[in-house]
Amino acid sequence: MTNVEKLLRVRPYPHMRVESDPANQAHWMYMHSQLAAGDRPCFRPGLMDDMWSFLNSITLREHQREPGRLRHVVVASDADAFNLGGDLALFAQLIRAGDREHLLSYARKCIDGVHHIHTGLGGDVRMIALLQGDALGGGFELALACQTIVAEEGVQMGLPEV
């Protein structure tokens, strides 16, 4: 007999931190875990790659799902802000370079990811956005795609076009 608890091993993600409880089928995904001081907590390509890689790794096919059982993913942030949206520095760089293909690729990745989250990773996952800091632009869109939003008092949410 041992007192050692077996923990789920999760692949390390350079731009986010994941904590999982396999017994309760719950996952906590913290964006911006390695964000350097002064960096903007936004959807950099590396963060998006990590997020979609993790979410795809826990997405079950229909025949793998347990009827009547929901899984949960909480999306949070290790930064002062939840997420401030698009990577504006990348946008400026790609626009100056006339790199339409990379801009379209970035946009498609955002749209596909938000759709995957909105559909509950295929239907058996409830996505919860935990806003302990501002959610602006695409960060707010991510929160809106979740089935539940929990926000601390004083958190600002909004879109630049409003």
Tell where the protein language model's regions lie, with residue ranges:
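Long amphipathic alpha-helix in the N-terminal Rossmann-like dinucleotide-binding domain
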Residues: 106-109
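Residues that form or flank phosphate/diphosphate-binding pockets in enzymes
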Residues: 38, 42, 83, 138
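A structural preference for short, pocket-lining loop segments at secondary-structure junctions
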Residues: 29, 50-98, 112-128, 154-155
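Glycine-rich beta-to-alpha active-site loop
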Residues: 117-162
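Conserved CoA-thioester-binding segment of acyl-CoA-metabolizing enzymes
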Residues: 1-73
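Short, histidine-centered active-site or binding-site loop motifs used for metal coordination
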Residues: 31-35, 95, 131, 161
